[in-house]
Amino acid sequence: YITSNDKSFLSIGSGIGGLELIINNKFENNTYYFIERNYVSKKVKYGWGGVVNDEAYNNLRLQKEFLNINGLRDDQINIFDFDSDKLPENKFDVIISLLSLGYHYDFSLYIEYLKKVSKTNTRIIFDTINSSYFTKIFKNVEIIKSDLNTVHKSKRIICSGFIN
């Protein structure tokens, strides 16, 4: 779902950035933008329907150190604190949010932002328990993984082409 033509990635709630390191090991010289929160919630919450949008499990300084130690250069890393920074307005090739957007954070809170930072062919990869809902939002919705026998009972989907 990711090719060598993809150069600009937005990760929402990626934690320390391990997936982005794996992507960079295969396709080097990409640019990564991370939208994160810079604190650890007192109580860890798991489950769908995080409408309040107040959870976080990250330390942005440690995230940057981890990415640097594991081979990402400073010019590849752009970390944005959701609570204090203006979010990036670049157009991205791929947007990834695994078990975050739609899991901890309500997808509807981000629709307008995602439209603003998406190209016509941007692929958005995230997890959901209601994949059919997204056929009303995107022209293309494909289930790429199902975890129906897990606690999360989720489907990972890849979407592109906003309808409106």
Model-predicted regions and their roles:
Residues 16-28:
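Conserved SAM-binding loop of SAM-dependent methyltransferases across substrates and taxa
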Residues 93-106:
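A short SAM/SAH-binding and catalytic strip from SAM-dependent methyltransferases
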Residues 50-85:
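S-adenosyl-L-methionine
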Residues 141-164:
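Core SAM-dependent methyltransferase catalytic element
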Residues 108-120:
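A short glycine-rich, Lys/Arg-flanked "PGG" loop and its adjoining helix->strand segment in the class I
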Residues 82-95:
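A short acidic, Gly/Pro-enriched loop at the edge of an enzyme's catalytic core
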Residues 121-130:
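Conserved beta-strand signature within the Rossmann-like core of class I S-adenosyl-L-methionine
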Residues 6-15, 33-36:
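Conserved class I S-adenosyl-L-methionine
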